[in-house]
Amino acid sequence: AYKGAIIPHLVAQELMSLNTRKSVKPIFWVREKNQSSAEVDLVVQFNKMVIPVEIKSGKEGKLKSLHQFIEAAPHPYAVRMYSGKFSIEEHKTKTDKKYFLMNMPYYLSTKLYDYLDYFVSNFK
């Protein structure tokens, strides 16, 4: 019952623990529109990009909000933290914008920036 709230909290805590010099609060993205809204669980700064991170409590889950973020982003990178295996997939949004999705198991959350370095360097 609490899985949907606990997992994002734990992942955010793991990422916050990486910043030992200053207190960093987790940042999320919200798009509010009259008839619909969208929310991405976390956004992280990597190089000069803001990368969306969706945190799912299981192996499955829709990525509708992530697609809306990617539509507005000047880069093709997104991350999903979930209970599955590591993989990188190529996807398209509804408007056919191509992007790359890096799927990471929760236990790798403290290695996010190392994996982002590999991800951004090798997928263009």
Predicted regions and their residues:
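A cross-kingdom feature that marks ATP-driven nucleic-acid transaction machinery
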Residues: 1-124
